[in-house]
Design a protein with these regions (language model features):
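P-loop NTPase catalytic phosphate-binding loop
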Residues: 1-54, 64-136, 149, 175-178
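Conserved P-loop NTPase
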Residues: 136-179
């Protein structure tokens, strides 16, 4: 299941109505999401704890990879934060529970805009894992990148546990001089 929060540019609007996708746009849709989504996440968490009873060595990663894929796609975290102005804590709680229960979170940040100190922005700024695509100097989510880790065309920066690692993006091949 995919939950899509489009930006005001509506560049992803053509996905509205796609099978397996919930396009969250209006205030009513956001309210429904905040009512229903946490329950789905709690069901996932409960299912994991139940599976642990029969297999105490089952890792969360293994379990969540074996059940239905759930992904949140957020085009512009600042716009989402603005739309959630009265429900910041609920949305930040959803994001945290989503991450905890193996739900993928894909989000874009407009580097010139992300200045907020709201709950949603704080969630993203305190993340310990992610991949950075684009100019690392303009990201307000991840810490500064050392010169030796600056990516070249076709690469991204994987951020894990406070460290960056250059990674090749699918569809690109490294040349001899880049490698």
């Amino acid at each position: 299941r995919i939950y899509l929060f489009d930006s005001s540019s509506r560049e992803l609007f053509y996905h509205r109505g796609d099978e397996g996708l919930s396009y969250v746009d209006t205030g009513e849709e956001l309210e429904d999401f905040l009512d229903e989504f946490p329950e789905k996440l709690l069901q996932r968490k409960s299912a994991y704890h139940k599976a642990l009873e029969s297999n105490p060595r089952l890792s969360p990663k293994e379990f969540y990879e074996s059940i239905e894929l759930m992904v949140l796609i957020i085009d512009d975290t600042d716009e989402l934060a603005e739309r959630c102005s009265g429900t910041q804590k609920a949305m930040a709680g959803c994001l945290a529970l989503a991450a905890e229960t193996g739900c993928g979170i894909i989000a874009t940040v407009q580097s010139m805009k992300s200045k907020g100190y709201d709950e949603v922005t704080k969630f993203f700024k305190t993340t310990t894992e992610g991949i950075l695509l684009g100019n690392p100097g303009s990201s307000s989510v991840f810490p500064a990148v050392s010169a030796r880790n600056l990516p070249v065309m076709g690469e991204g920066l994987l951020y894990h546990g406070g460290e960056f690692e250059r990674v090749l993006l699918p569809g690109f091949e490294m040349t001899q001089e880049e490698g």
